[in-house]
Amino acid sequence: MIEKIWSGESPLWRLLLPLSWLYGLVSGAIRLCYKLKLKRTWRAPVPVVVVGNLTAGGNGKTPVVVWLVEQLQQRGIRVGVVSRGYGGKAESYPLLLSADTTTAQAGDEPVLIYQRTDAAVAVSPVRSDAIKAILAQHPDVQIIVTDDGLQHYRLARDVEIVVIDGVRRFGNGWWLPAGPMRERAGRLKSVDAVIVNGGVPRSGEIPMHLLPGQAVNLRTGTRCDVAQLEHVVAMAGIGHPPRFFATLKMCGVQPEKCVPLADHQSLNHADVSALVSAGQTLVMTEKDAVKCRAFAEENWWYLPVDAQLSGDEPAKLLAQLTSLASGN
């Protein structure tokens, strides 16, 4: 229902306009206070790159963060990552991730980023505290990437990157809750890079698509082409589950059942195992896999995806960030 409201297919969005105006008024006032220096920002001693969204819902932001971290690491840059840690609840903050950190403590996306990149990752409701924790333990970190936080204006940033779903784009264009917008589309004029996940990019936007890899067994780590798996039940607890189901079909998989879950939804063995019957195979996202690995069964697999950016702009962006991190 919410997708139909935000896309404009349902007329119910008009009923929510008063709340949207209030949201826009408050969020605009907050940003104005920071622009006029009525509210103080905090600046880290190293460059900060924000990777965020203008809209609520999944846009492919986490794969972009992983791509960015890996690309900088390949260039010899030591990277730290900070996040709010949505879906997690630590005993205390800031929390610096380790091999023993669970998604219940840190949230699924920070754990995924940590496992994929081996970068220093910290979570905290106050992102400046997370940055301080990283730099205290890893003083050699040269640049910080913040996963989300475009609207967290208390944190000064050197580069802003926005990720857009190229198919859904901005829906009906209204602020939450009548539409999907955290900020209006005009905000794009002030950011450094706009990455468009799928669809048809517009002038100045960087095209991106998600490239699926081989399916990975949660228990054994065995890999195979996902099309070889039979009697598949697909599960996705991400911001936009239909994208994952479409990816499976693109790979030649016709799921017997597709199960969309809420983003950051907590999972347990009983609930997940109930999704599959005897002889069926469960295929989930990598983001779900980090929550399920501890209690996985032999017929559970996940399909990793990697962000693939095209054109000349990614190289220019990476050169800019490498120069920033190197102090040039």
Swiss-Prot record:
GO terms for biological process: lipid A biosynthetic process; lipopolysaccharide core region biosynthetic process. Its EC number is 2.7.1.130. Keywords: ATP-binding, Kinase, Lipid A biosynthesis, Lipid biosynthesis, Lipid metabolism, Nucleotide-binding, Transferase. Transmembrane segments: none annotated. It catalyses: a lipid A disaccharide + ATP = a lipid IVA + ADP + H(+). InterPro entries: LpxK, P-loop_NTPase. ATP binds at residues 55-62. Pfam families: LpxK. Pathway: Glycolipid biosynthesis; lipid IV(A) biosynthesis; lipid IV(A) from (3R)-3-hydroxytetradecanoyl-[acyl-carrier-protein] and UDP-N-acetyl-alpha-D-glucosamine: step 6/6. GO terms for cellular component: plasma membrane. The keyword RNA-binding does not apply. GO terms for molecular function: ATP binding; tetraacyldisaccharide 4'-kinase activity. Signal peptide: none annotated. Disulfide bonds: none annotated. It is an enzyme of class 2 (transferase). Belongs to the LpxK family. Transfers the gamma-phosphate of ATP to the 4'-position of a tetraacyldisaccharide 1-phosphate intermediate (termed DS-1-P) to form tetraacyldisaccharide 1,4'-bis-phosphate (lipid IVA). This is Tetraacyldisaccharide 4'-kinase.
